[in-house]
């Protein structure tokens, strides 16, 4: 594991529980509706297989699974995955969560219809590499729309 990855892992391991409390509160307020509407606008129609990269406490994964999508959330931090599973269980939502490095995905091509992420790129040593995730998904609408939105988070790349 590279030094930066270790620092990110240590940072989020210490903060996982408190961050989980914040996201639990957020899932029950009007901000969730706004995020849900924005995701609906950006994602193709229909029930999708969605990969949530850097799922953290599972916020996006839970929002999307509640809409009937099949969601897999991945995160580098086992403590965050624990928080994500707890949130999904608490809300009786079915989603799959795995510990995995966002820059070394272990899924065959076309495993997903869409890939989402929130607040991930700032933690990555090479954020542009996540844009190479497109082969893991097959998109039916403009596959660049979400990438453009992500690039706004790291314009220097």
PLM region descriptions:
Residues 128-140:
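A short glycine-rich, Lys/Arg-flanked "PGG" loop and its adjoining helix->strand segment in the class I
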Residues 114-127:
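A short SAM/SAH-binding and catalytic strip from SAM-dependent methyltransferases
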Residues 1, 93, 155-157:
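N-terminal accessory regions of S-adenosyl-L-methionine
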Residues 49-53, 57-104:
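Class I SAM-dependent methyltransferase SAM/SAH-binding core
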Residues 1-45, 59, 63, 83, 141-157:
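Conserved class I S-adenosyl-L-methionine
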